[in-house]
């Protein structure tokens, strides 16, 4: 399976390692661009590719969202993820350790509002990283 990973921090990079070890091809992206991912991609080997966020979203049969909650601009346009499996590993944490007020909504409901038509699955939200 081809998996696009949006976010290359603790969760995104760890997931990339695990997906590659399981035999999947991955496209890793972050807000700083593909050049900033050279070391990680080198570590992961030929099954891994550094891409822009939009290209990683296009690449994946499934896509992992592993970007900070405060950066919704890191999410691609909804049409790029329409009908794709989207694994939501985001949590509404503020930088100070508190939570963003979602007005009674859940984080997954908020993500689905931003990405209508995707097949959203909440995943990895109770772990920091493996």
Task: List where the protein language model places each region.
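Short amphipathic alpha-helical segments
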Residues: 16-18, 40-41, 75-79, 98-100
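Fold-independent oxyanion-binding glycine-rich loops
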Residues: 8, 30-31, 53, 67-68, ...
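Rossmann-like NAD(P)-binding element
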Residues: 45-47, 51-96
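Rossmann-fold NAD(P)-binding glycine/threonine-rich loop
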Residues: 89-130
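NAD(P)+-binding Rossmann beta1-loop-alpha1 motif at the extreme N-terminus of oxidoreductases
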Residues: 1-43
